[in-house]
From Swiss-Prot:
GO cellular component: cytoplasm
MF terms (GO), sorted A to Z: 4 iron, 4 sulfur cluster binding; lipoate synthase activity; metal ion binding
Entry keywords, A to Z: 4Fe-4S, Cytoplasm, Iron, Iron-sulfur, Metal-binding, S-adenosyl-L-methionine, Transferase
Pathway(s) it belongs to: Protein modification; protein lipoylation via endogenous pathway; protein N(6)-(lipoyl)lysine from octanoyl-[acyl-carrier-protein]: step 2/2
Keyword DNA-binding among record annotations: no
EC number: 2.8.1.8
Identification of the protein by name: Lipoyl synthase
Residues annotated as domain Radical SAM core: 80-297
UniProt entry tagged with the keyword tRNA-binding: no
């Protein structure tokens, strides 16, 4: 019998090391079993990387993290080249170990009390008008990190009064009441929490999370702030069916969610969950039409769409795909 892995605080566990800690075991994908990417999934890199390197340098200077880098987002080059980024607070080590996600797992260090001010100054220096703030899961904190979110929102607005702030929050498992009490006092301009996939394969895709809990979080925030858009997103290609996706969309509308994102799942490494199918642009267009017919005010649906992809345009109701 193998000895249990003892995690050291502050150490990032990735790929095989991370997957070894997941209760639902995933079989490493052999190279010849990988699905070939279709033409529509091939991303062109910008010829000039000056802006990209500038944003990375600003992050490093202030000890900040972006989910774009930590989660290996395929849109990083495009977004950084346009001067946009999704900031990830509360460190770069997640207490969860979802097998679709490339963010490192482990025992995180204490939150940086100076991070809200450093984040606010960086955003002001970049002259951003719309910013997305997300975080790793912090099940080690009594409020799940909600107060840190609130502190960041307050600091950002103090330095950039005209800015619009979208928060992409974790599920605050076991801490919803405390977290919402804090966030209700300092709400963002858009409240985002991703369901990620469909109930049938939830335990495999999001071990440690609960589908109905996430729906309740979105519903309760909307009840407290009916004027603030609520948003959620799914990855497709993990084994779900289009019919199941449509049913999740109905669940989201029943819980008051007004904005939707749907994008293609891409396997970060052979140790992560494999891609089961590539959904065509035409299928995404059909699901977008279904979403708008259900009453979503905006639906960004396309192979390269991610939750915060062109989030400023999404918030304005402009076409994103």
């Amino acid at each position: 019998m193998s000895k249990p892995i003892v995690m050291e605080r502050g150490v990032k566990y990735r790929d095989a090391d991370k997957m070894a800690l997941i209760p639902v075991k995933n079989v490493v994908t052999e190279r010849d079993a990988l699905l070939r990417k279709p033409e529509w999934m091939k991303i062109k890199l910008p010829a000039d990387s000056t802006r990209i390197q500038g944003i990375k340098a600003a992050m490093r200077k202030n000890g900040l993290h972006s989910v774009c880098e930590e989660a290996s987002c395929p849109n990083l080059a495009e977004c950084f080249n346009h001067g946009t980024a999704t900031f990830m607070i509360l460190g770069a080590i997640c207490t969860r170990r979802c097998p679709f996600c490339d963010v490192a797992h482990g025992r995180p260090v204490a939150p940086d009390a100076e991070e809200p001010q450093k984040l606010a100054q960086t955003i002001a220096d970049m002259a951003l008008r719309y910013v997305v703030i997300t975080s790793v899961d912090r099940d080690d904190l009594r409020d799940g990190g909600a107060q840190h979110f609130a502190d960041c929102i307050t600091a950002i607005r103090a330095k950039s009064p005209e800015i619009k702030i979208e928060t992409l929050v974790p599920d605050f498992r076991g801490r919803m009441d405390r977290a919402l009490d804090i966030l209700n006092a300092t709400p963002p301009d858009v409240f985002n929490h991703n369901l990620e996939n469909v109930p049938r394969i939830y335990r495999q895709v999001r071990p440690g999370a609960d589908y109905n809990w996430s729906l309740k979080l979105l519903e309760r925030f909307k009840e407290a702030h009916p004027e603030i858009p609520t948003k959620s997103g799914l990855m497709v290609g993990l084994g779900e069916t289009n019919a199941e996706i449509i049913e999740v969309m109905r669940d989201l509308r029943r819980h008051g969610v007004t904005m939707l994102t749907l994008g293609q799942y891409l396997q970060p490494s052979r140790h992560h969950l494999p891609v089961q199918r590539y959904v065509s642009p035409e299928e995404f267009d059909e699901m977008k039409a279904e979403a708008l017919a259900m009453g979503f005010t905006h639906a960004a649906c396309g192979p390269c769409v991610r939750s915060s992809y062109h989030a400023d345009l999404q918030a304005k109701g402009m076409e994103v795909k």
